[in-house]
Regions:
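Active-site-flanking beta-strand signature of metal-NTP-handling nucleotidyl enzymes
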Residues: 2-9, 51-53
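Short beta-strand micro-motifs enriched in acidic
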Residues: 42-44
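Short, surface-exposed ligand-recognition loops at beta-strand->loop->(often short) alpha-helix junctions
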Residues: 9-20
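An amphipathic, aromatic/His-enriched active-site/gating alpha helix that lines ligand/cofactor pockets
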Residues: 24-37, 54-89
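Residue-level signal for secondary-structure boundary sites
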Residues: 14-16, 60-61, 95
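Short hydrophobic/aromatic beta-strand element in the GNAT-like acyltransferase core
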Residues: 3, 38-39
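Short, low-order "capping/linker" segments at domain edges
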Residues: 91-99
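A short, glycine/Asx- and small/polar-enriched loop/turn
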Residues: 46-50
Length: 99
């Protein structure tokens, strides 16, 4: 299991755009229902910082880049971010119904 955490801070004036694009992306994921991944995005209390967690099962290719809505979200993010996003792999040491 591979888990990636992405941390993004967006410009306050783009929060509505970010969240609308994220909703479209997650709706597309719900429709496509790709197997072998789990993906979530959360907004932190400051209102402009987001954390996304992506788990991809071993042996599964990341299906996100195949979704037009994901590519549109990634493209928009270039304009919406206040600073470059950071990402890092996580090592899961325990989980209850999360991963």
């Amino acid at each position: 299991m591979n888990v990636l955490m992405v941390h993004s801070k967006v410009k306050a004036e783009h929060v509505a755009e970010v969240e609308a694009a994220a909703k479209r992306m997650f709706a597309a994921l719900q429709q496509a229902q790709p197997q072998g991944i789990r993906y979530t995005s959360c907004r932190l209390p400051d209102g402009v910082t987001y954390v996304a967690l992506l788990e991809i099962d071993d042996g599964v290719d990341n299906p996100l880049p195949t979704l037009p809505e994901f590519r549109a979200f990634q493209e928009g993010l270039k304009q919406w971010v206040a600073e470059p996003p950071t990402s890092e792999p996580l090592t899961v040491i325990g989980s209850y119904r999360f991963f």
